């Protein structure tokens, strides 16, 4: 991993794509204008967008070098919610699931994750070989979707948990996002300076950015 690697991951959404090729990811996700960027440059840009005018957090994503066999794509564009609300930084979980399905058709496995403690917003959507095998999204302590077979880490959390509501519905949190992500692929914050990265990272524009006509911004 490059010496400039930065691993403070908080309040963020991301994709994990098995052995994903950057150019193909850009194509499949309808991204554009990829420019080479280091970890520091890419992540700083994505995080800075969050504090800019409404919708900026949806404008760019950072495609990381290949780490432990996975290519991560980080940015608010992958936040799975109940419906599209782009200026508020949200997209329908159905659209995120469709993107995971598409990516897994090409690369074998793809997952989407949201870890937002302050917003009580957590999700994991897992796909293999062109099929979404698990969807779990909770927002403001409301479970929006709970379909498919739970991952082993999730099943254990459910068995050990006392966080069921009055209706007996389990409500996952950020710890579960971490554990499911780690089981399925890699959890970004558990990478470190000794983690070997392969290839380059890229900062790319989302369809939302192009629609608004925001000029290309360099890292």
Predicted regions and their residues:
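Short, extreme N-terminal segment that most often corresponds to the first beta-strand
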Residues: 1-33, 214-219
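Residues that form generic nucleotide/phosphate-binding pockets
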Residues: 28, 102, 106, 183
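Long, compositionally biased intrinsically disordered terminal regions
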Residues: 73, 121, 128-219
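Structured loops at beta-to-helix junctions and adjacent beta-edge loops in soluble globular domains
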Residues: 18, 75-77, 208
């Amino acid at each position: 991993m490059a010496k400039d690697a930065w691993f403070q991951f908080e309040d963020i959404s991301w994709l994990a794509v098995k052995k994903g090729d950057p150019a193909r990811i850009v194509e499949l996700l309808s991204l554009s204008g990829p420019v080479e960027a280091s970890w520091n440059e890419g992540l700083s840009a994505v995080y800075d967008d969050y504090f800019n005018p409404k919708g900026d957090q949806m404008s760019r994503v950072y495609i990381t070098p290949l780490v432990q066999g996975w290519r991560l794509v980080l940015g608010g564009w992958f936040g799975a919610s109940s419906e599209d609300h782009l200026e508020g930084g949200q997209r329908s979980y159905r659209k995120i699931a469709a993107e995971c399905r598409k990516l897994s058709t090409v690369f074998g496995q793809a997952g989407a994750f949201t870890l937002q403690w302050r917003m009580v917003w957590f999700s994991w959507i897992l796909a293999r070989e062109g099929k979404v095998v698990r969807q779990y999204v909770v927002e403001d302590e409301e479970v929006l979707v709970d379909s498919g077979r739970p991952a082993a880490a999730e099943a254990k959390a459910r068995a050990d948990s006392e966080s069921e509501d009055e209706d007996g519905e389990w409500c996952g949190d950020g710890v579960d996002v971490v554990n499911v992500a780690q089981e399925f692929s890699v959890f970004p914050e558990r990478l470190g300076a000794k983690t070997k990265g392969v290839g380059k990272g890229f900062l790319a524009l989302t369809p939302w950015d192009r629609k608004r006509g925001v000029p290309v911004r360099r890292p």
